[in-house]
Design a protein with these regions (language model features):
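Mature-chain termini and adjacent capping regions
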Residues: 1-146
Length: 146
């Protein structure tokens, strides 16, 4: 899917989901008890059962009551239907909402999408909307040459 600057400009001003997830991150940290280690959680599958997106983390806790996954040393991956990697996000610490497939990164992260990458600190992302918003220390690299 090609980048749409009009779509990005339309969505960039609405921070309601950002605020919701930042609050969820803080609440998850307060409730955290004995996180599991080396966790892998599918977020979504294709109709054929193959994983479309997943979260892996060195340490994680799944909050069954809210659907949130809190993790440290997190990798969120999105795949194409043929199983190849479509996009990935590596983060120090984040919370992911399994229902909306969106998340908030507390600390540093890098997202790779094709031959482009973005990194920074304090990052909101939405897999469904293919949207990312970086709140500080942003850096964008693209392989686009034309």
């Amino acid at each position: 899917m090609a980048f749409s600057s009009a779509k990005w400009l339309e969505e960039r001003g609405d921070d309601s989901d950002v605020m919701r997830l930042r609050a969820a991150y803080a609440e998850c940290v307060k409730k955290l008890e004995a996180p599991a280690e080396n966790v892998q959680i599918p977020l979504e599958t294709f109709p054929n059962g193959q994983v479309k997106s997943r979260v892996t983390a060195r340490r994680a806790h799944v909050f069954q009551d809210t659907g949130f996954v809190w993790g440290e040393k997190v990798r969120v991956e999105q795949f194409k239907e043929d199983g190849s990697l479509f996009a990935s996000l590596d983060a120090e610490s984040c919370v992911v909402d399994r229902k909306t497939k969106s998340g908030w990164v507390e600390g540093a992260a890098q997202m790779v999408y094709g031959d482009s990458s973005v990194k920074g600190r304090g990052i909101y992302f939405s897999l469904e909307r293919e949207f990312i918003k970086i709140f500080s220390q942003s850096e964008i690299r693209t392989g686009h040459t034309g």
